[in-house]
Amino acid sequence: MKQSMVFSPTLREVPADAEIKSHQLLLRAGFMRQNASGIYSFLPFGLKVLHKVERIVREEMERAGAVELLMPAMQAAELWQESGRWYSYGSELMRMKDRNAREFALGATHEEVITDLVRDEVKSYKKLPLTLYQIQTKFRDEQRPRFGLLRGREFLMKDAYSFHATQESLDEVYDRLYKAYSNIFARCGLNFRAVIADSGAMGGKDTHEFMVLSDVGEDTIAYSDTSDYAANIEMAPVVATYTKSDEAEKALEKVATPDQKAIEEVSAFLNIEADKCIKSMVFKVDEKLVVVLVRGDHEVNDVKVKNVYGASVVELASHEEVKALLNWEVGSLGPINVTGDIEIIADHAVASIVNGCSGANEEGFHYVNVNPERDFKVSQYTDLRFIQEGDQSPDGNGTILFARGIEVGHVFKLGTRYSEAMNATFLDENGKTQPLIMGCYGIGVSRTVAAIAEQFNDENGLVWPKAVAPFHVHVIPVNMKSDAQREMGENIYNSLQEQGYEVLLDDRAERAGVKFADADLFGLPVRVTVGKKADEGIVEVKVRATGESEEVKVEELQTYIANILK
């Protein structure tokens, strides 16, 4: 492709609203442009990268036995109502009405549509297992779109769905697609981890996320320093043991703590360590109020609270709700003298506290010498806190460290969550009606492009891995007015294309500095500069990733490039 014919508008300045490298560079290099908040156009170079990622995804999905189809982006509300998610999915689901006032959703995901499709066509175990996938635009009304393609309102996604007669069949396909995902992200050149995850609004139980390691990632990964254990911090169990001291219990005492609300403030004011304080939080668990207790130096993990109750929705009660429903002061919440049918659950660490402190549910007061079970009753002790760096790894090997990650893929074992809700059944080999067992497997294709850009860049621009680069080689005649440079550049361009390389020829009448700056910004793997030594049959070859350059004779160029790109 000749650069003079390409629509690739570059920017010299960093856009003011672009916070992270990938967003900045994809805009500056002319790979995309914003249409509205969280909505982008892919320009020609960006589209080529997107297509490269799509091709890798398709190859690995088909190798894993999945078959491609395409479902509608616009989905009837009745299907979402049938599954129950019309009411529970939340405000991220974009809803609309047609001219006849019939309700629809723009597809945020396609479990309902695929389940409806398969239930009408697959009636026997003989047609199972079946794995179908699509690559299609998705829509989510993000409250705060940010970071360019990493959190948008419109994005390209690969979503696959598998249907099974037995759990063993699901396990087999799940493992196969787990490996396919690992292959996809490895082929894209990414540094990633597969981690144990929470299924969230998707439902189901067993699930893994594929996380690209990056400081700008919105998720925290907890991983072992000596084993391959890795989990989303929400899902990492705490295996620590706590020893209760033999200190004699003291008499409960209520003390004034004026203007002291945070654990750090209270512990400093009372001259007591934070790990002897009891942190109390009120949650709405499917609208039921629950008091959750953790140690003062720990944080409540609401996903674990949700899993304790098998709840659909868990959210922290607001200050106003706590005051109105319980007449408690949020800055001084505590478990003592809790009345009514409000349940108290506590993290294991709370049971070991002796002569601790807690809020008194009264403005400006706390209790000291608090002892669980003597001063208040707990209905259940369980794991309710976030794991911390330095904790023992849940697999028993090593200690936990943290890293940030960008989620680019997610695989779920949905089980019968959707098939039972939507009456999607088949006849088993005994002629009995059974619900289809399902799996779900998603990849953020456009998000993967951003994740690659986030991992592969330097101070001068993008540095694309060869598997996804829009072109393999960038040929730059420095002076297009020089017949020797222009003709050699075109000859190299043509011969490399004949060898199967994708080549970009900078045939613009621009200054050398502009051409080189754009080349660095585009980030193609190899740059061939045709300069003053063209008359001698010598060009300069530069590797973008390393910055290494070398003068090469034209007759040796193809072999030299082949060695770089092998």
Curated annotation (Swiss-Prot):
A GO cellular component annotation in the UniProt record: cytosol
EC number in record: 6.1.1.15
Transmembrane segments: none
Annotated localization: Cytoplasm
GO biological process, one term: prolyl-tRNA aminoacylation
Signal peptide range in chain numbering: none
Pfam family, one: tRNA-synt_2b
Described function: Catalyzes the attachment of proline to tRNA(Pro) in a two-step reaction: proline is first activated by ATP to form Pro-AMP and then transferred to the acceptor end of tRNA(Pro). As ProRS can inadvertently accommodate and process non-cognate amino acids such as alanine and cysteine, to avoid such errors it has two additional distinct editing activities against alanine. One activity is designated as 'pretransfer' editing and involves the tRNA(Pro)-independent hydrolysis of activated Ala-AMP.
Domain comment quoted from the record: Consists of three domains: the N-terminal catalytic domain, the editing domain and the C-terminal anticodon-binding domain.
Name under which the protein is recorded: Proline--tRNA ligase 1
Source organism (scientific name): Bacillus cereus (strain ATCC 14579 / DSM 31 / CCUG 7414 / JCM 2152 / NBRC 15305 / NCIMB 9373 / NCTC 2599 / NRRL B-3711)
Upper taxonomic lineage: Bacteria, Bacillati, Bacillota, Bacilli, Bacillales
